[in-house]
A protein has these predicted regions:
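Small-residue transmembrane helix packing/gating motifs
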Residues: 273-296
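Transmembrane helices with small-residue packing motifs
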Residues: 11, 19-57, 113-123, 387, ...
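Transmembrane alpha-helices and their membrane-interface boundaries in multi-pass membrane transporters
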Residues: 401-415, 438-457, 464-514, 628
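Helix-loop junctions and hydrophobic alpha-helical segments within the transmembrane domains
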Residues: 325, 332, 336, 412, ...
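Surface-exposed amphipathic alpha-helical segments in non-transmembrane regions
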Residues: 14, 21, 26, 30, ...
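Membrane-helix entry/capping segments
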Residues: 291-296, 302-349, 381, 389
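Signature of alpha-helical transmembrane segments and their immediate interfacial
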Residues: 1-33, 437, 507-565, 651
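Hydrophobic transmembrane alpha-helices and their membrane-interface caps
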Residues: 23-35, 45, 348-416, 457, ...
Length: 681
């Protein structure tokens, strides 16, 4: 018999288990850590800018031509688009689950290139950017200034030079987006009265700028000649100072008098756009969001981004600081830690239960060794399947502990039964027992696999959940069966002793505990038998109980709220402020500041960031939109249901109900990264 080899050669069984453990540890080290499996469909974003255009113009002249060409790209499911009154255009293309995001981005870029000739010249000049990224932010942080000499424009440009380029180089970062475009720009404010008196139109100013503010290649002199020297000519290039722009010549008359730009306009160094204002706890700031590229390791990416930001913060100017508003790792780390704790607790509880019922330390040791081998070995196959360490796979392993221990217990109990029948040695008892139960162990394993394997064929985003959960359990059960046929019999032959050797024992605490437990368990068993006999004589009671439970199940199924995944307290709240159309930025800022003041008064609040000019739910930019980002205190400081995220959101709704002239919504970030910008919808 094949199993005899493993029983008589325990080293072989041990080597098999050690190999499984080593492979499992290697797989565990190599596997990425995520909160949930990668189920969000790959997305590709196309963004463009049409300076000076409103939302209608952007929609008709930019978005429509792009959508017409992008529509129908390979593996596309649908797309969404937004147009802002600041001239911004954004199209997000969603693809089928499991497609290659790199190939999707290439296909979209090819379609965008077809639409480029149809776009306005100003749009093509500023560029149409195609990037692969998820729709939700995995990190939000702000750079603040307590120094009055550093305003938002300075912070934006400092970040553009010293922070954003470093973050974009991090592996897994799809995009780093700053709210608003406060890049340093030369602002030319035309004076209509002066323009009219000289008979000028804005195109005259634009043409003069295009002719005189250029990068030129003047060439060389003295090349290929009989001169002794040759020189490369240098041109000063684009203008940099306001006074240089002021002296741009607009036109000249026949007498030689020159009309300069300063005669018809005011020139100053300012911001490219004034449609967005930001503040953190009433201090000037800029807010940036980090987006994940599809198919990357979010946990490792966020850790590297944290390191990059910490390095950059060490060289910030005096009075400038960084404030981390939200990071997906904060909730992920504590979630994984709690599940690992549960995993360890489950193993300890199972070991205690096994010890209480088997009432023998040697017998308890066998399942206690077999369970870790099955659990750790599972990680090798999970890594082979391309899975991640996430809440689903860890939860499956928690359940697997209670399942895989059964195989080892079956083997131990079977060997004990043979020892009770006066088998001379543990080896002979193990051989006899395995001859009888090996078929049962294999059949039980196949039945359990038949339960979990079929659900892995479900497709779509939901199918990814079932696949990782089902295969994790199936693999753990299969490894447990291998242990039950190799390691557990070998350990039984080595550790167990014939019962007559242990017949006489000194009465101690454990023996008294065993006697009391067995007596109580025996009494419970007798009561259970009597209840079964009672129900056997009155079958209608059992039938009625079944019907009641079915009815209760149907009722609970109907009244229990349904959802894809439960909402989680991630210590982060977002607020969307929406005013009537055509509302000014100043009006939006005042209302957003009111909301920020109310939010800061909440005892659970850590910091609040206000962004006026950009909305969350609308996804667009404009003077009538605003948003807030609120970072709550750690969970240890918010114990109790009254301090939970849901409770804080409800309190904020109540506290801001008196603010008139605006719609204010408080929302939590999405539980699943890449599935929208918010949760609860």
């Amino acid at each position: 018999m094949t199993l005899k080899i493993f029983i008589e050669r325990p080293v072989l069984s041990t080597v098999i288990s050690v190999i499984l453990v080593i492979l499992g540890i290697l797989g565990l080290i190599a596997m990425p850590i995520t909160q949930y499996p990668e189920i969000a469909p790959p997305t590709v974003q196309v963004s463009a800018s049409y300076p000076g255009a409103n939302a209608d113009v952007v929609l008709n002249s930019v978005i429509v031509p792009l959508e017409e060409q992008i529509n129908g790209v390979e593996n596309m499911t649908y797309m969404t688009s937004t147009a802002g009154n600041d001239g911004s255009a954004s199209i997000t293309v969603f693809f089928k689950q499991g497609t290659n995001p790199d190939l999707d981005a290439v296909n979209v870029q090819n379609r965008v290139s077809r639409a480029t000739p149809l776009l306005p010249a100003d749009v093509t000049r500023s560029g149409v950017v195609t990037s692969k990224r998820q729709s939700s932010m995995v990190m939000v942080f702000s750079i603040n200034s307590s120094n009055k000499s550093f305003d938002g424009t300075f912070l934006q440009n400092y970040a553009n030079i010293n922070v954003i380029p470093m973050l974009k180089r991090v592996n897994g970062v799809g995009d780093v987006q700053a709210f608003g475009t406060q890049d340093y720009s030369m602002r030319i404010w035309l004076r209509p009265d002066a323009m009219a008196s000289y008979g000028l139109v804005p195109d005259d100013i634009t043409n003069a700028l295009a002719e005189q503010n250029i990068e030129a290649a003047p060439g060389k002199i003295g090349e290929n000649s009989n001169q002794s020297f040759q020189f490369v000519l240098k041109y000063k290039g684009r203008l940099k100072l306001p006074v240089e722009y002021e002296n741009i010549i607009i036109k000249a008359d026949s007498t030689g008098q020159l009309l300069r730009l300063k005669d018809v306009a005011r020139v100053e160094l300012g911001s490219l756009d004034y449609s967005v204002t930001m503040s953190t706890d009433n201090k000037p700031s800029i807010v940036m969001g980090v987006f994940q590229a599809a198919g990357t390791n979010a946990h490792a990416m966020i850790k590297e981004c944290d390191s990059v930001i910490a390095t950059a913060a060490r060289s910030f100017p005096p009075g400038v600081s960084m404030n981390m508003i939200f990071t997906a790792n904060q909730f992920l780390d504590i979630s994984i830690h709690k599940v690992v704790e549960t995993l360890i607790e489950a193993f300890i509880l199972v070991s205690i239960v096994v010890f209480v019922f088997l009432q023998d330390l040697r017998s308890t040791l066998i399942p206690a060794i077999a369970v870790p081998v099955a659990i750790v070995g599972t990680f090798f196959f999970l890594n082979l399947f391309g899975f991640t360490i996430n809440l689903l796979t860890l939860f499956a392993l928690v359940l697997a502990i209670g399942i895989v221990v059964d195989d080892a217990i079956v083997v131990v109990e079977a060997v004990h039964a043979k020892l009770d029948q006066h088998a001379p040695t543990a080896t002979e008892a193990t051989l006899t027992a395995m001859n009888e139960i090996s078929g049962a162990v294999i059949s039980i394993t196949l039945v359990m696999a038949a339960v979990f394997v079929p659900v892995t064929f479900i497709t779509g985003s939901v199918g990814v959940f079932y696949k990782q959960f089902g295969l994790t359990l199936a693999v753990a059960i299969l490894i447990s069966a291998v242990n039950a046929l190799t390691l557990s019999p070998a350990l039984c032959a080595l550790l167990l002793r014939p019962h007559h050797e242990n017949a006489l024992r000194q009465k101690g605490f454990l023996q008294r505990f065993y006697s009391a437990f067995n007596a109580a368990f025996g009494a419970t068993t007798k009561k259970y038998k009597r209840s079964i006999q009672f129900l056997a004589r009155r079958r209608w009671i059992a039938g009625l109980a079944v019907l009641v439970f079915i009815g209760l199940f149907a009722f609970l199924l109907k009244v229990t709220p349904a959802g894809f995944v439960p909402n989680e307290d991630q210590s982060f709240i977002m607020a969307d402020v929406s005013l009537p159309p055509a509302s000014s930025l100043e009006r939006t800022t005042k209302i957003a500041d009111q909301v920020m003041t109310i939010a800061r008064q909440q005892p659970e609040m850590n910091s609040v960031v206000r962004v006026a000019g950009s909305g969350i739910l609308s996804g667009g930019a404009g003077g009538s939109y605003g948003s807030l980002f609120m970072n709550l205190k750690d969970w240890d400081l918010r114990k109790g249901e009254e301090h939970s995220l849901t409770a804080v959101i409800n309190k904020l709704f109540g506290a801001t109900a008196g603010i008139k002239g605006a719609k204010i919504f408080f929302i939590a970030p999405p539980t699943l990264e890449g599935f929208g910008n918010t949760s609860g919808f």
